[in-house]
């Protein structure tokens, strides 16, 4: 039988805990408890405890979480917000739809926002920085906080891919005014559809988002401000609450896989691997994704084709383009380092459906392509 390893096995998300998930779905369906009910409250409490933040809110998705956070922070038309161009377009979209101007900057060798590029992009209109905690890795928050203090800037985090990742013992999403998370099905903690969350230590930010996520409604029949519809439904909240309870098992496996990749591929000089687990005591990586670089960009296409022929799925993050490269967004700038990285990088499988045998097979085929044998 030919081995087939998809980039991500969505069926495994359900099958892994089939009985528990079916019970949750049946229970909520039979009770008709669907929107802003106890399951949502429970999940918000557990999310705040998990991140060690004072407040947490469930929202429709991470994009909404970012938009609601930006608006709650008072960022508006005429303001500029700096972000890394190596991110999903949602980061820029949230800034744009708030009325502010998104300012993309370079990423660094760690694929996270480049610290020096932040300072170079600051103008009299700069209001905030939104670093993306990418692939389950956290930026150097000491340096970013130092810049925010120096220039009196707000800090909000796009932690869509990094729930549970840490920098010096502190959770992603808790360094600034707020942090937004994605619960898309492929995430470490993912629901069965779209879902998002926001954490904050600010009562003011919490109260503003609490209102604006539900049409600006304080209670039935009482609209106190302009709002939108971005509510995490009870079914998703209950599933997320269950999956949050299994978080440590998931992360343990991901870090085991990352260690196997490191041990099996670190001698392959034609590729660059992400930081290895525990290589930096200040950081705790959760490996939402495993993004590698091919040193020679001309080899990437044939490398991917070789893996595909051997039934190994890969993807190019964001379709292989940084945000500023999409013509329809009209950024009209060049970020050479990020552009070069996007021509060389790709994601290889990283999820709990993978067996040790699967990982060894992937390692074997990568080594073979670059002429290292087994």
Regions found by a protein language model. Give the residues of each.
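Helix C-cap/helix->beta junction micro-motif
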Residues: 98, 150-151, 310
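Hydrophobic/aromatic ligand-binding patch that stacks against planar heteroaromatic rings
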Residues: 93-95, 147, 188, 235
């Amino acid at each position: 039988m030919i081995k087939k390893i998809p980039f991500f096995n969505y069926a495994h998300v359900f099958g892994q805990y089939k009985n528990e998930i079916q019970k949750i779905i049946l229970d909520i369906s039979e009770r008709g408890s669907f929107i802003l009910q106890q399951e949502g409250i429970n999940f918000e409490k557990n999310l705040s405890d998990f991140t060690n933040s004072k407040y947490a809110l469930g929202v429709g998705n991470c994009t909404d979480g970012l938009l609601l956070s930006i608006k709650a922070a008072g960022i508006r038309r005429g303001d500029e917000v700096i972000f890394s161009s190596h991110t999903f377009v949602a980061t820029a979209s949230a800034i744009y739809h708030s009325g502010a101007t998104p300012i993309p900057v370079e990423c660094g060798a760690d694929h996270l926002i480049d610290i020096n590029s932040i300072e170079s992009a600051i103008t009299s209109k700069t209001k905030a920085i939104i670093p993306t905690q990418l692939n389950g890795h956290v930026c150097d928050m000491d340096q970013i906080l130092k810049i925010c203090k120096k220039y009196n800037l707000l800090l909000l985090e796009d932690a869509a891919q990094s729930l549970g990742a840490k920098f010096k013992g502190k959770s992603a999403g808790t360094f600034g005014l707020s942090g937004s998370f994605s619960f898309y099905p492929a995430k470490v903690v993912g629901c069965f559809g779209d879902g998002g969350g926001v954490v904050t230590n600010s009562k003011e930010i919490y109260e503003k988002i609490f209102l604006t996520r539900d049409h600006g409604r304080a209670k039935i029949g009482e609209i106190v401000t302009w709002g939108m519809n971005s509510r995490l439904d009870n079914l998703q909240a209950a599933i997320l609450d269950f999956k949050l309870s299994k978080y440590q098992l998931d992360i343990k496996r991901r870090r085991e896989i990352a260690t196997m990749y490191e041990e099996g591929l670190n001698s392959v000089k034609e590729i660059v691997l992400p930081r290895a687990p525990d290589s930096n005591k200040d950081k705790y990586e959760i490996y939402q994704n495993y993004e590698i670089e091919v040193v020679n960009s001309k080899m990437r296409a044939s490398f991917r084709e070789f893996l595909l022929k051997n039934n190994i799925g890969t993807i190019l993050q964001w379709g292989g383009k940084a945000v500023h490269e999409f013509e329809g967004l009209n950024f009209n700038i060049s970020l050479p380092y990020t552009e070069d990285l996007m021509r060389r990088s790709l994601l290889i499988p990283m999820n709990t459906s993978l067996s040790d045998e699967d990982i060894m097979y992937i390692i074997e085929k990568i080594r073979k392509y670059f002429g290292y044998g087994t």
